[in-house]
Amino acid sequence: MLLVDTNVLVDVLQDDRQWANWSIRQRRAQACIHPLTINPIIDAEVSLSFSTFEGLDRAVSTLGLALREIPRPALFLAAKAFVQCRRRGGSRRQVLTGFFIGAHAAVEGWPLLTRDASRFSTCFPTLEVMAP
């Protein structure tokens, strides 16, 4: 499994000028190696790009994404990492949702495909981050 971060999916779905090509190539390449996965946090964040649930559901299916629940140990790790990163001077703009994503991948032992390598690498040092 490989967890695909929200920013990669938004790049693909909204045809982002700067990042769409990289995100499309990476998603396709990784789909040949790993089953692609999202969690409810990513699903909710991506849903902002759609006016209906059916549109979101079609896109998730078309992109070959499986939805996996976040295990409780990952929720625990997310909270601990959030507090630890804030204490080390992390940005006050960082929100807990990103920590749920990083902790989910870390606890499951899955790589994470993202454009936000620095935050995930800093807060989850054992996490395999695939980023530009």
What are these regions (language model features)?
Residues 66-115:
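Active-site neighborhoods of divalent-metal-dependent phosphate/nucleic-acid chemistry enzymes
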